[in-house]
Amino acid sequence: MNVQAQIENYITGQPEPKRSDMQALHRITLRVSGECKLWFLDGKDSENKTVSNPNIGYGSRTIKYADGKTTEFYRIGISANTTGISVYILGIEDKKYLARSYEKKLGKASVSGYCIKFKKLKDIDIDVLEAAIQYGFEHEL
């Protein structure tokens, strides 16, 4: 199954209203990103054990480890979870930037160094979330 089909299955497998929110968020992220690499991670490790929630990734970045090894990973990710939806904005050097710049304007959301969590899209200002996603695509370590 290709990545597009995996993403579609993941989103349509969500209960409402999370399904509609994930579909809208997927469309927003695709619009902001333009043409980019899509990822789907099922949340399972090499032994097929669940280690995280499944997530959809957008874009590409290179992560360099202390030992000099590198790996490719996504820039923006979205994931449905038991408490709502998480948006991951990776590669921002200033770990306080997201909270400082967006938390007060977002509405009912919690913001960490790389994650924006909310229960439903209707609880937040979508334009502010879109601006944070745009920032994530434009700025990287």
Feature annotation, model-predicted:
Residues M1-L141:
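Charge-dense, helix-prone N-terminal extensions
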